[in-house]
Amino acid sequence: PFGHAGEAALTDMMGTPFHHNEQSLRVVDKLERDGDGLNLTYEVRMAILGHTGSRIPETLEGQVVRTSDRIAYINHDIDDAIRAGILSESDIPREIADVLGSSHSARINTLVENMIANTQNTGVLSMQPEVAAAMDSLRSFMFDRVYTNPVAKGEESKAKDIMRKLFDYYYTHPDKLPEDFIPQLDFDGISRTICDYIAGMTDKYAIYKYSEIFIPTAWQVR
């Protein structure tokens, strides 16, 4: 949960780097089907592992997933920033909007359709240079205006605090883990088991569990 803030929190608590792509591969290889894994193909597994980070996917399937992930998260992050009042559509530089479009759907259509058309023309998974440059500029803009924004950073510290408190709670109360995770304690240890459980939460579920554990239930007024 909580994107890169959650990754950073789990890294601190585990004492080793936590990467969500590696965790996703762990889920399908080792955790699903009661530890038997899903027996996925090499291509699918490498697409999961290579969708982010410095590792460039070896397969076309992996390259499609990696590019699709970038298209998705940039545009969803714009929507989140607009809802949070950090950004408005009019803040996006005109030179970027002129190439990609000035709405969520327009940007995604431009990027996806251009990638398909240019790949068909060149035989290499790619976008036209102008569109690729606009996407890179949009990503840089998001780092300048959103990812390092003090408001966003403030929310990030709250998210990390939720993660740490959940981790500490389950570390001292492992019996409170879901029943499915109890057997895992014997062969993966307490920290790894808690990490797997928390890493599988959504933002909303992490907040719900935090509230359930740490926020007193209000007295019902009669």
Residue ranges and their predicted role:
Residues 18-222:
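Histidine-centered, transition-metal-coordinating active-site segments
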Residues 1-15, 21:
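Aspartate-rich (DDxxD/NDxxD/DxxxD) Mg2+/diphosphate-binding motifs
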